[in-house]
Amino acid sequence: MLGAVVGGIASALASGAASKLFGGSQRGVSVMQQGAESAGLTNGGGAISMDNDQGIQSAIQGSNVPPAGQLPESQNSGVMADAGNMLRNAGKSLLDGTIQAGSDKVKQALIDKLIGGNDAKDRGKATRDYLAAAFPELNPWERAGAGASTAGLESSAQNQQKEMLKMQLDNQKDIAKMQMDNNLQIAGIQSATSRQNTKDSVYAQNEMLQYNQRESQARVASILANTDLTTKQATHEIMRMALTRAQETGQHLTNSQIMALEKKVYAEIGKIHQDTQNSRYGSSQVTAAAKDVTNMITDAASGASDWVSQQWNSFFKDGKSNGISLNTRK
């Protein structure tokens, strides 16, 4: 009998689990009843009986006697009631666990269906279909990303090369501009220095010539004032003084220039002597004559300096100064 009870319980539980998964709760109860009847645990009315023993049941029924021809309702109490409750609880727990496991599996299947399960092939196909619809202008190779990384790297490298080349060109341009500015500044400094040096040199030379001219004029006046000297002697003294002064200043006269100057001085001295004798104020006449003679000597001796002054005034005058005056006829 114990084997029949255990077999009936197992059959009922299995049938109940199957009914919960595939047919609902009503079908599960029907299957459990069929299992109990096959195990001999029912009396045909759906109640569990113990070999049709109605002794205890009759005592419990009391005055509630069933109608004729109908079996009394079976009720369990005591140990049998506890055994029935235990069987029902065990079956319910097993059935609930089976249903929970089945529902978890269904839930996971639903999630996999909605957002993609663990099938990499299916997910890859879905991704390719999506990319093909979203980017129809790309070919499969580009949508797969096979050439994207290389293209990005090449584009980045080209941009970097362009930026580096631009920086190099900008640096070269800046360096060239700096060099040009420096060269212009150096050239300007050199030009200004050269002009200033030339101007200073010419001015210094001019001042020296003017000093020499004044000194020569004083000496000529002294010679002319000496009445003890003849015209020839006076001419000789004046020429000797003029040639000495020319050598001191680095000016050299040719023989023809010396001869021409000597003739002019001789004629001028003769004229001075005649005018002095006829003049009331001899000293003033001597001074004027000395200046004329000195100018003649200066014209011949300082020709080179006058040429430099003329060149300066013609080519180097900046428009802000008066230039350098000539040495003649001071």
UniProtKB/Swiss-Prot annotation:
InterPro entries: Microvir_H (IPR006777)
Primary location class: virion
Pfam family, one: Microvir_H
Region (Disordered): 57-79
Compartment annotation: Virion
Keywords from the named record: Capsid protein, Viral genome ejection through host cell envelope, Viral penetration into host cytoplasm, Virion, Virus entry into host cell
GO annotation (BP), single: symbiont entry into host cell
Superkingdom per UniProt: Viruses
Cellular component terms per the entry's GO annotation: viral capsid
Keyword Thylakoid (UniProt): no
Role according to the record: Minor spike component of the viral shell. Involved in the ejection of the phage DNA in the host and is injected with the DNA in the periplasmic space of the host. Involved in the determination of the phage host-range.
Subunit structure: The virion is composed of 60 copies each of the F, G, and J proteins, and 12 copies of the H protein. There are 12 spikes which are each composed of 5 G and one H proteins.
Protein name, as recorded: Minor spike protein
Gene that this sequence comes from: H
